[in-house]
Amino acid sequence: MLMPKQMKYRRPHRPRNIKGIAQRGATVAFGDFGLVSLEAGWITSRQIESARRTITNYVKRGGKVWIRIFPDRPITQKPAETRMGSGKGSVEYYVAVIKPGRVLFELNGVPEDVAQEALRRAAQKLPVKCKFVTKASQEVGSNEG
């Protein structure tokens, strides 16, 4: 699982404000194909790992996969049937906060139809709606702007 090596504060506040669209990480930079989120939400480290395994399994370990998000926000939970008070709960998992337009995964070294199917299967593992994009389609879209 992905998680930060070291944090300044062990149990910070929950990520709340997920308004607006992604400014950073919104273009396909490394590969030729990408998976872009269409809505805001949290993606856990387990969901990222599940999607990564799905992609690598479908492309039969051919090509290269880039994970463009990192789960850096800890989410705490208290044990079940615990009374109120007695401090904040322990860290249960880490999430990446996603805004619409954020590139989640990139893929290179495989044909477009294989990449599209692999990223479609990966999108089914994620809690946000996603779409398939290519580097060429993004360049055309940015010039029209």
Curated annotation (Swiss-Prot):
Q: Name one GO biological process term.
A: translation
Question: Which SUPFAM superfamilies did the record assign?
Answer: Ribosomal protein L16p/L10e
A cellular component term (GO) from this record? cytosolic large ribosomal subunit
An MF annotation (GO) of this entry: tRNA binding
| InterPro entries the UniProt entry points to | Ribosomal_uL16 (IPR047873), Ribosomal_uL16_bact-type (IPR000114), Ribosomal_uL16_CS (IPR020798), Ribosomal_uL16_dom (IPR016180), Ribosomal_uL16_sf (IPR036920)
List the keywords (alphabetical): Ribonucleoprotein, Ribosomal protein, RNA-binding, rRNA-binding, tRNA-binding
Please provide an example of a Pfam family that matches this protein in its UniProt record: Ribosomal_L16
Q: Which family does it belong to?
A: Belongs to the universal ribosomal protein uL16 family.
Quaternary assembly: Part of the 50S ribosomal subunit.
Q: What does this protein do?
A: Binds 23S rRNA and is also seen to make contacts with the A and possibly P site tRNAs.
Q: List the protein's name.
A: Large ribosomal subunit protein uL16
Q: Which organism is it from?
A: Herpetosiphon aurantiacus (strain ATCC 23779 / DSM 785 / 114-95)
- Gene behind this protein: rplP
